[in-house]
Regions:
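Bacterial N-terminal signal peptides
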Residues: 6-16
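Tryptophan-anchored aromatic micro-motifs
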Residues: 26-45
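Generic short beta-strand segments
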Residues: 34-40, 88-96, 124-130
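N-terminal glycine/threonine-rich, aromatic-flanked beta-hairpin/loop signature
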Residues: 45-86, 93-94, 120-121
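Acidic, glycine-rich flexible loop segments
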Residues: 89-118
C-alpha cells in the first residue's frame, strides 16, 4: 500500500518541473544572452565605449550580468515584463580605479524589446555613476543588441 503515496509524490514532483520548463521557452526573456553594448554621451551621441556582456534573466525577476571590462564587478539586478514583448531591467555594479580602489557604483536602467520569436532583443537606457556618498557624478545613454545564447 506504500506504492500509492510514492506514485503521488512522484506525480507531484513532475508538475513543478513541467511548469518551470514552460516558463523558460524562447518566447520569454528568461535565459542567457550575448549582448553588445554601446555607451554614448547623451548630449552629443558620441561613443564613449563598446562592451561585450552576458545577461542572465531568471524566472523570479532577478538578473545578473558580467562584462568584458576588467575594472568593474559583476552586476546584480531585477527585471519585469511590462506588456507584449516589452520589459524593463535595472542592475548595479562597482567600478574600480586602476589601483583597484572603489571609483563609483553604476546603475543601468533600460527598456528591452524582445523580437517576435524570442531570439534577439534591443534596448535603450541610461548608465548613471554614483560616488561613495551616493551623489550622481555622470550619466550616459546606452543601446544594446543581444542574441539568445545557444
Amino acid at each position: 500500500m506504500r506504492i500509492l503515496p510514492a506514485c503521488m509524490m512522484l506525480a507531484l514532483g513532475v508538475v513543478p518541473m513541467q511548469a518551470t520548463g514552460s516558463a523558460e521557452e524562447p518566447s520569454h526573456l528568461n535565459g542567457l544572452w550575448n549582448v553588445s553594448v554601446t555607451i554614448r554621451n547623451c548630449d552629443t551621441g558620441a561613443v564613449i565605449r563598446n562592451v561585450r556582456a552576458l545577461n542572465l534573466f531568471v524566472h523570479d525577476g532577478s538578473m545578473s550580468e558580467t562584462s568584458s571590462n576588467s575594472r568593474r564587478s559583476n552586476s546584480l539586478g531585477v527585471w519585469r515584463h511590462l506588456r507584449d514583448n516589452i520589459y524593463t531591467s535595472m542592475f548595479e555594479f562597482f567600478r574600480y580605479n586602476p589601483d583597484g580602489t572603489f571609483a563609483t557604483t553604476a546603475r543601468v536602467t533600460r527598456r528591452i524589446e524582445l523580437n517576435a520569436d524570442g531570439t534577439e532583443f534591443v534596448t535603450t537606457g541610461t548608465v548613471e555613476d554614483f560616488d561613495s556618498q551616493n551623489v550622481r557624478v555622470s550619466v550616459g545613454c546606452s543601446t544594446e543588441t543581444a542574441v539568445r545564447a545557444q
